[in-house]
């Protein structure tokens, strides 16, 4: 096999997107985890302007793909299972880093990814934990907001407040904290979005002070829930708002019949990890971020999110 790498590509053709989507499915079936997170899917679909792409082809067959997100400073890449260990991932990684020195995601912490990281002289800089909560039908969850706050559902005129609270809650989070109103609308345009599942906490004046954006999607005909984003205005942190919103979302998703609820959280965020553990969640897998041992001076290696840290 003598693949040819094409790139950087600013805008993918429809055929390219279809072939890469087929590659994603093949890698997911083989590895048990998708090589792209939600942000990566948005980039593949052309819903963002910050992604650059590289494609490895053997003849007409797509055997590898990489994308770099200039806004999040991250790289995601994949190689078709039959084409692995032939230098394709190394070539794609080096091509992407020449343009965007970045952190590279390894979803599921696959052994092959660890080997490649070592070969390229990369170090582990982040761990993103996937936690899960089984949903027995008799599991009680009550939501009790602090005095002066009330639980409500998102309204269209809440969008600016939602974005502002999200930014404040994730101010040290270049990915989640950078969510714009347009980003939020893109997420709300997805098939799974249900306005009833975007729960908010308001003060007595009606101001939004926190939110729990839940997600329910079918997996092989079985509904599965997710704590998609949980954010609280910093002025209300430590008052039980995050836990109350978490419980309200769990109750909402339980009523929809989900079999389990998942979430993603930074491994370094011990306070929030402990909150989720107290609610019954446990770690089921780990995503790892790798970066050059000597990061580029302009690169921000602060706390970032993947497909997104869901924080409280």
Curated annotation (Swiss-Prot):
This is Mycothiol acetyltransferase. Belongs to the acetyltransferase family. MshD subfamily. InterPro entries: Acyl_CoA_acyltransferase (IPR016181), Bact_Acetyltransf (IPR050832), GNAT_dom (IPR000182), Mycothiol_AcTrfase (IPR017813). Residues 297-312 have a biased composition (Basic and acidic residues). Residues 8-136, 149-301 form the N-acetyltransferase domain. It comes from the Bacteria. CDD domains: NAT_SF (cd04301). GO terms for biological process: mycothiol biosynthetic process. The gene is mshD. 1D-myo-inositol 2-(L-cysteinylamino)-2-deoxy-alpha-D-glucopyranoside binds at residues 38, 175, 215, 226, 264. Its EC number is 2.3.1.189. SUPFAM superfamilies: Acyl-CoA N-acyltransferases (Nat). It is an enzyme of class 2 (transferase). Keywords: Acyltransferase, Repeat, Transferase.
